[in-house]
A protein has these predicted regions:
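…primarily DNA-binding HTH/wHTH and HhH modules…
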Residues: 1-8, 74, 98-135
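Basic/polar phosphate-binding segments, predominantly the helix-turn-helix DNA-binding elements
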Residues: 1-6, 16, 28-64, 85-107
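Terminal helix-turn-helix DNA-binding modules in bacterial transcription factors
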Residues: 15-32, 52-87, 115-134
């Protein structure tokens, strides 16, 4: 019973940290700060976070930043790739582009162009819209 209660507490703490990360994606994160949000020591937090999410903290933060940045590339076309890189806390556009390409296997510029072309095609060919929305 105690183990189940501990697990619930850990889950609540990790969800709290995940919410904190989501709300502060544009700022750099410090392990001690996130551990404090969770209410654990740095070592304990890092271990618990990895065991619950199956990702290291750095992997998780980068994945979330890249997912949000990918959405910005499509829906915030008025922003340059450099603006998006800085907004999500990358030191420069080269680091962002390299990290993005390692994750999506395509550069941010190619990703943006590909998705925009796909959206334009879907608008002119409504039959394909349901297929595109599923992806």
């Amino acid at each position: 019973m105690k183990s189940a209660q501990s697990h619930k507490r850990y889950l609540r703490s990790i969800h709290k940290v995940q919410d904190y990360i989501e709300e502060n994606l544009h700022t750099p994160f410090v392990l001690s700060e996130l551990a404090e949000v969770a209410g654990f020591s740095k070592y304990h937090f890092h271990r618990i976070f990895s065991s619950i999410t199956n990702e290291t903290l750095l992997q998780y933060i980068n994945r979330i930043k890249l997912e949000r940045a990918a959405a910005f590339l499509i829906y915030r076309t008025e922003l340059s790739i450099t603006d998006i890189a800085y907004f999500f806390g990358f030191s420069d556009s080269a680091v962002f582009s390299r990290t993005f390409k390692n994750h999506y296997f395509i550069s941010p510029k190619e990703y943006r162009n590909q998705k925009i072309k796909l959206a334009r095609f879907a608008k002119t060919h409504p039959i394909y819209w349901c297929i595109i929305k599923i992806q």
